[in-house]
């Protein structure tokens, strides 16, 4: 069965385009019906980020869930990992995060979590899609069995305490000047407060959401403002989260970016030395730099690769017993603490290492020299450009040209109509030639569709 709604990270699209109140209501009904298991009164936790359309989607989903007899617990703007944590903590049957993650305000999305706080499997999402295509009128609750909705107070404090508990009790951030960029998103209240409670000297940017400015020239996908602020304030470190705070990028005291691959290297080495790695290796995606793989090999650690998407990283971690994984983009999963990527908790693990070593972030967080990596995107309107013979030929030729001295990855995005072409290797000029040839072939195929 083809997936008409769900991508690699829930349902995502333009607000009042794909993501309409009608769809949100139907998702609430379908997911609510599917997760009403057992005889207890069923509950769902709903959180959101700060984009304007969040109100519209939130109320539509409340209508959907309550119409099938499920109670709704509204927590307001909260990080995605906080919603996952609260779903389990509140003994809910289901969790919902209304967010389009790092996208701009025009988009929105719906992420669903099971009762243990894990994202739903492909099979469960397919079951929801089947229900979305059916008429559910005859499955609605009777009048006396409709669900109730209420807003929950104190959830910010719950997440702050959860995050703080991931650090040793005797470790504080006293003496560290930290600039944090919350992307005008879901973490704008909780993360600065948590850092302050841990003893850091906190300078906050991206903490004035207005419904329109989420991820706009700020956050983990646009860290330039953070880099400038770190240098300006002579800070020790910068933390950039995205709109729903499930990914993080750091900036060292010189204003240089530390991406997800480097963060994985820092945490992996630290945890290995402390005996905290569950297995001698970590899990990352096919997008992680070959430099990370070589660094880990030097540490006696294995890099296990998965398809792109933090859910696939987590699935492999759980299946094979790893407790550290993530993506180059900054999704870092620490399964000892969280059931999904948690940008802030990942940042805290790095801050803990910095505090213990008492060395500058620039020395602690640049563990390897990344191989030159070229990533280009080709947008298309319709069809399947990757099925074109010319594209297949260009990919085959490119792989032969790299000949074991690099990697080539060509894939469709799981969240938008884009073909991503990534190449990396020791010879940057050769990699760029190979990528450009494939981009041209994909572009021609897309234009002919």
Curated annotation (Swiss-Prot):
Pfam families: PGM_PMM_I, PGM_PMM_II, PGM_PMM_III, PGM_PMM_IV. Its EC number is 5.4.2.10. Activated by phosphorylation. CDD domains: GlmM. SUPFAM superfamilies: Phosphoglucomutase, C-terminal domain, Phosphoglucomutase, first 3 domains. One of its GO terms (molecular function) is phosphomannomutase activity. The modification Phosphoserine is found at residue 101. InterPro entries: A-D-PHexomutase_a/b/a-I, A-D-PHexomutase_a/b/a-I/II/III, A-D-PHexomutase_a/b/a-II, A-D-PHexomutase_a/b/a-III, A-D-PHexomutase_C, A-D-PHexomutase_C_sf, Alpha-D-phosphohexomutase_SF, GlmM_bact. Gene3D superfamilies: Alpha-D-Glucose-1,6-Bisphosphate, subunit A, domain 3, Alpha-D-phosphohexomutase, C-terminal domain. Binds 1 Mg(2+) ion per subunit. Belongs to the phosphohexose mutase family. Its cofactor is Mg(2+). Catalyzes the conversion of glucosamine-6-phosphate to glucosamine-1-phosphate. GO terms for cellular component: cytosol. This is Phosphoglucosamine mutase. The keyword Flavoprotein does not apply. The active site is at residue 101. It catalyses: alpha-D-glucosamine 1-phosphate = D-glucosamine 6-phosphate. Keywords: Isomerase, Magnesium, Metal-binding, Phosphoprotein. GO terms for biological process: carbohydrate metabolic process; peptidoglycan biosynthetic process; UDP-N-acetylglucosamine biosynthetic process. It is an enzyme of class 5 (isomerase). Mg(2+) binds at residues 101, 242, 244, 246.
